[in-house]
Design a protein with these regions (language model features):
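Beta-strand-centric surfaces of beta-sandwich/beta-rich domains
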Residues: 1-149
């Protein structure tokens, strides 16, 4: 059995601009943004956090390596990625940026060098900005550096 260890790591979609929908409650055009995972290890995603100018955003994720989607259809980001505890603006100060993450029931394993496509659409009727973090661990083979003789 190969020895493995996990290192905490965060991948993120940063400063994603989402075009306004035609009106509140109307789903806008889905826009794709990609996130490339490193080629040095698998990644075990364990929780999501996000901050946006308005949390009325629909999202869906597709893993390009397998072509599989994480959901059967687009979901409101608030229902799958937790939510900011104090406010929801991208311009939060350090004191205000307290997040309530959305932990996964089981880690979601992403293969090395995978590209994840986030499809996002505004539902608020206003131009939206989004940042989203994937919290988890890089799964590495071999002895942990802190356990080496």
């Amino acid at each position: 059995m190969k020895e493995t260890y996990a290192e905490y790591f965060i991948y993120s979609f940063d400063d994603v601009s989402i075009t306004a929908s035609s009106g509140a409650g109307t789903v806008g055009t889905y826009e794709n943004t990609s996130l490339r995972f490193d080629s040095d290890s698998q990644f075990a995603a364990q929780a999501w956090t996000f901050v946006s100018t308005d949390p009325q955003i629909n999202v869906r994720f597709q893993e390009t390596g397998h072509g599989r989607y994480m959901f059967d259809r687009a979901k409101q980001i608030r229902t799958v990625a937790g939510r900011p505890v104090a406010g929801s603006s991208v311009g939060l100060t350090a004191v205000e940026s307290l997040f309530s993450p959305m932990p996964f029931l089981a880690p979601y394993i992403v293969e090395p060098a995978t590209e994840m496509i986030m499809e996002a659409a505004d539902v608020s009727g206003s131009t939206n900005a989004l940042r989203m973090a994937w919290h988890g661990s890089k799964l590495r083979h071999g002895p942990a550096p802190w356990n080496k003789p």
